[in-house]
């Protein structure tokens, strides 16, 4: 699954993000919905405003083994029918493989940054 990279990330963070993504056989692409301002609405935005390095990344909309457009259609369906509604919960048919990959990715990027003496 591709990852989405927000342009506000610092250079060393971006370098580590690309390294780990490549090791996982993944690609990093720009935010597919920048008009929604996800980075600016995030919990870590106040830290980033004050110069604290912030990793802003998330799962994309392309899925391995699915046709182009499948992920966007599912995302649009979820947003229209479930997002911030009583039905907004984990569904039994959700494939969490990408979420596991994301957790491994974030951990490894964070670990490598923690081992670095510069930002």
Which residues make up each language-model segment?
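His/Asp/Glu-rich mid-to-C-terminal helical/loop segments that flank catalytic regions of hydrolases
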Residues: 58-119
């Amino acid at each position: 699954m591709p990852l989405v990279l927000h342009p506000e990330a610092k250079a060393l963070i971006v370098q580590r993000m690309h390294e780990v993504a490549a090791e996982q056989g993944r690609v990093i692409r720009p935010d597919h919905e920048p008009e929604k301002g996800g980075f600016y609405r995030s919990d870590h935005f106040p830290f980033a405003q004050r110069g604290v390095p912030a990793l802003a990344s998330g799962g994309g909309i392309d899925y391995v083994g699915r046709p182009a457009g499948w992920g966007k259609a599912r995302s649009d369906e979820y947003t229209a029918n479930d997002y911030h509604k009583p039905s907004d919960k984990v569904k039994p048919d959700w494939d969490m493989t990408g979420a596991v990959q994301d957790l491994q990715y974030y951990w490894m990027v964070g670990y490598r940054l923690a081992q670095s003496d510069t930002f």
